[in-house]
Amino acid sequence: MLFSSLLVSTLVSVATAANQEVEAIQFSNLGFSGTYNQVEKLSNIYKDSCSCEVNKTPVSFSGTNAPLNEEVSVHFRGPLVLNKFASYVSDGFKYGDDSSGDWKRLSYYEGSSGTSENVTFLTSAGKNSSCLGIGLTYAGTDGISKADSSTVLAKNTLINSNDEFVIFSNISCGKSGYNNDCGVYRSDIPAYHGFYGTTKMFLFEFQMPNETHTSTDISNYNMPAIWLLNAHIPRTAQYSMNVNCSCWRSGCGEFDIFEVMNSTEYLHMYSTIHDYQGSDDIQTGMAAPAYIERDLTGTMSGGVAFDSSGNAVVWVSNSTSFDSTIQASSVNSWVKQAGADVATTLATVTGQSATTTSKKSGGVSYQPSFITNLLMTVLTLWVI
């Protein structure tokens, strides 16, 4: 790899601790040139001989926000109530520039009215495979049970710890195949396209109440999250131990928007990028050195915007609206009104090599890299 820059800085304080509370997080210089391994074949998926093969030629990517410029699915883990969701695209939005491109809404869900536009709710309630794990099905109105057809999430639906559902678009995939529109996927799942766009935005109105319904022994206890995955991942295997059953480990892209990462920091929502831009440890990823406070009793509104210049901005703000068209100035004002924020500039990377076999799992605490700690120490001493 070639690292031409690595800088961690704050917009409000020079000496920023890893546990600083903020209401907006910015990643700059997002996107790099690299490759990932795409699944080419799934064999005997419900037998002990289940296996997966990747194509011998890795998929190449480059450009602004890559590989997160590809289609993504939107994932939710409890304890969580989703009130509203919307996805947007823009021709040229640039963070901080009020005259840049406006946002056009492509998808919308509102629980109170039962509105559902270009969204499909899926959940892991399908058949179990020894190498792929549990397959996707349509989600019932409770978000976690199996349904026979596409169903809208019911108003005020609470999912508990370790329960998950995912939102795709309502555009069905064509036939499974390496060179087809959705690539290879499990033949018995409802397969849909994710949300496209280099310049895209996702908005959420949600609650993350304290867990009161499940045992503390359960995985991901009281650790809610909202995150994005390259849409190829859940269509094959989201939680497989076989490196060839998903493109995740080879770096096709994950963005954790709001994630409680361990039960001791259950009030802290972190934002993390999991690919190989500036890190060779995809499980730990590149986390912003700050957190957004989780509100246990109220409703939170916010989102993430990927702009046309390689900035990804995460925020919470009560001013967030879900209009069919949103001006650039509105998004900029939401972030500005959020108050204290932190910025992380990612390394410029070329010649990415994916060799790790680690897997994302719950309960991983954010640990700053050696370089980040060194920079923070130097900056703190400079201030003193």
Curated annotation (Swiss-Prot):
Superkingdom per UniProt: Eukaryota
GO biological process: cell wall organization
Recorded catalytic activity of this chain's protein: Hydrolysis of (1->3)-beta-D-glucosidic linkages in (1->3)-beta-D-glucans
Keyword Endoplasmic reticulum recorded: no
UniProt-annotated glycosylation sites, renumbered to this chain: N118, N128, N170, N210, N244, N262, N318
Name of this chain's protein: Probable circularly permuted 1,3-beta-glucanase PGA52
Pfam families per the UniProt record, alphabetical: YJL171C_Tos1_C, YJL171C_Tos1_N
Organism of provenance: Candida albicans (strain SC5314 / ATCC MYA-2876) (Yeast)
Record keywords, A-Z: Cell membrane, Cell wall biogenesis/degradation, Glycoprotein, Glycosidase, GPI-anchor, Hydrolase, Lipoprotein, Membrane, Signal
Keyword hit for Glycoprotein: yes
Propeptide: 362-384
Motif window: ExDxxE motif: 254-259
Topology relative to the membrane: Lipid-anchor; GPI-anchor
Family per similarity comment: Belongs to the PGA52 family.
Enzyme nomenclature, EC number: 3.2.1.39
Entry's induction text: Expression is induced by fluconazole and repressed by CAP2/HAP43.
Gene Ontology, cellular component aspect: extracellular vesicle; fungal-type cell wall; plasma membrane; side of membrane
Domain description: The conserved ExDxxE motif might be important for catalytic activity.
Major place of residence: membrane
Biological role stated in the UniProt entry: Probable circularly permuted 1,3-beta-glucanase involved in cell wall modification through beta-1,3-glucan network alterations such as increased branching or remodeling.
